Regions:
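Histidine/acidic-residue-rich catalytic or RNA/ligand-binding cores of hydrolases
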Residues: 23-26, 61-69, 105-109
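Acidic/polar loop patches that form or flank catalytic/metal-binding clefts of enzymes
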Residues: 3-15, 50-54, 126-132, 154-155
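Feature representing long, continuous alpha-helical segments
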Residues: 2, 88-91, 114, 118
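Aromatic-lined glycan-binding groove of carbohydrate-active enzymes
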Residues: 39-97
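C-terminal functional modules
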Residues: 95-110, 114-202
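Active-site beta-loop-alpha junctions enriched in small/polar residues
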Residues: 16-19, 34-36, 55-57, 96-100
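Active-site neighborhood of glycoside hydrolase catalytic domains
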Residues: 1-30, 34-48
């Protein structure tokens, strides 16, 4: 991180719950928070900058059957308890699009929009000033704006707000990716990591 700092480049690291040995980490390293380690509050108060990557409803690649548009919009991101002076160190929210199973831009558009608009409003608007009903009223203009900027295949509101049966279908189709050896291997690795983290936290 010192080398990058000398070159004028900020370094960022993905931080899961198990990363507690912060005495070895330069405070200039930005944390991408996935999980909330016990030392989060102390670190951000001491000046470490962070990006909130905690909330699964903001993962753009997850199916609308898991988190529909309203569930994403009404989710309140988890943040550490910090004072107003330290709030500047919270740089924003992450809305990742993992592309292992996103074969083309049509699929990327479908996964990302209109969900990204909901996440942007969450990041920029205080909870008391957010309204799902008001957000819905703005969607028509939002779709027009997407078209102007070349987004050709956003999810329709019906696709982004599936009924129970359609939501189940979306989830089943998404989960089919685990029905091969590589997918099963990933599940096994995930279970091992969770077990290791739980053991360290005892």
């Amino acid at each position: 991180s010192r080398y990058l700092k000398e070159k004028g480049v900020a370094s960022m690291m993905w931080n899961w719950d198990s990363v507690e040995a912060t005495q070895w980490l330069d405070r200039d390293i930005i944390w991408q928070m996935c999980g909330m380690p016990k030392n989060t509050q102390a670190e951000i108060t001491a000046g470490r900058r962070m990006v909130n990557s905690v909330s699964f409803p903001y993962y753009l690649d997850l199916p609308y059957g898991w988190f529909n548009l309203r569930a994403t919009y009404e989710n309140t991101p988890e943040i550490p308890h910090i004072d107003a002076a330290s709030a500047k160190n919270l740089l924003g929210l992450e809305a990742p699009l993992w592309t292992e199973y996103v074969p083309n831009m049509k699929k990327a558009d479908y996964c990302t929009y209109p969900r990204l608009g909901a996440i942007a409003e969450i990041a920029w608007t205080a909870p008391e000033n957010r309204s799902w009903a008001h957000f819905q009223q703005k969607l028509e203009d939002y779709y027009r704006l997407l078209s102007v900027y070349g987004v050709e295949h956003p999810a329709t509101l019906k696709q982004a707000m599936p009924g129970a049966l359609r939501a189940k279908g979306y989830s089943l189709w998404f989960n089919r990716r685990h029905l091969h050896w590589a997918g099963l291997h990933n599940l096994i690795d995930d279970a091992k990591v969770k077990k290791s983290v739980a053991k360290q936290q005892r």
